[in-house]
């Protein structure tokens, strides 16, 4: 059940049977980018990983994608027991906020806080803050910050991918239309407020690019991932300028 207010839409209870419908009802936009309210982390239940650009009716990449793993378990709200759940769309920002406490089949409990925003002053930018706190787990936590294929992956052809030390980008073309999009991403990770400086493992596949980072935690430790993604397209820029423009926007955040 959703609660509608002047500037917010709130969800107080977790109902997996209604998740797909609620994701669509909480769709948000900054008049250039538009996203459904799908979970950032992996979810094995029904969902639509949709991000749209103004003027293109085909979903592009899953810009907000991440993955969270413990030593031998993967965070998945469809499988884990949801102890507490709250989600709120702040329509005037636009910002999607989610607070979740979950317990794995092996009894490990995590507290998740996710804040995903489509910027109004830089409309080509999506910003994500994703916080993972261990409540009773001691061991490694691996977080992947990635760009992955979305709902309409078969309609996009990858032209070029790049994964550096702290940023990555992908350049794609829509088939059969002659439309091109470049998406660039950077990230940072902190543990209990201190920057994590170890070099990540690069992830570079045809349908997924990004970074994998592992930290050992004890109960009450908190990892915070900050992720920025820039999207530019050939409706607004010359195709040969897309990569440079995406990197320029990312640098100027």
Regions found by a protein language model. Name each.
Residues 1-24, 32, 37-38, 43, ...:
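Acidic/polar, glycine-enriched structural segments that form the non-catalytic walls/loops
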């Amino acid at each position: 059940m959703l609660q509608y207010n002047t500037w917010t839409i709130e969800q107080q209870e977790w109902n997996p049977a209604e998740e797909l419908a609620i994701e669509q009802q909480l769709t948000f936009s900054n008049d250039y980018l538009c996203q459904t309210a799908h979970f950032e982390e992996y979810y094995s239940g029904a969902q639509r990983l949709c991000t749209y650009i103004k003027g293109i009716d085909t979903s592009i990449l899953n810009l907000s994608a991440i993955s969270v793993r413990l030593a031998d378990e993967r965070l998945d709200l469809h499988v884990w027991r949801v102890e507490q759940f709250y989600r709120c769309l702040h329509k005037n920002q636009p910002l999607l906020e989610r607070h979740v406490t979950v317990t794995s089949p092996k009894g490990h409990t995590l507290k998740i806080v996710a804040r995903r925003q489509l910027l109004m002053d830089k409309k080509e930018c999506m910003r994500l803050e994703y916080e993972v706190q261990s409540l009773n787990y001691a061991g490694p936590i691996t977080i992947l910050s990635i760009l992955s294929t979305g709902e309409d992956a078969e309609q996009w052809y990858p032209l070029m991918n790049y994964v550096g030390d702290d940023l990555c980008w992908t350049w794609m073309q829509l088939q059969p239309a002659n439309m091109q999009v470049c998406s660039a991403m950077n990230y940072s990770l902190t543990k209990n407020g201190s920057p994590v400086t170890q070099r990540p493992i690069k992830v570079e596949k045809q349908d997924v690019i990004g970074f994998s980072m592992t930290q050992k935690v004890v109960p009450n430790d908190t990892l915070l991932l900050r992720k920025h993604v820039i999207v530019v397209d050939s409706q607004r820029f010359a195709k040969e300028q897309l990569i440079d423009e995406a990197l320029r926007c990312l640098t100027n955040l």
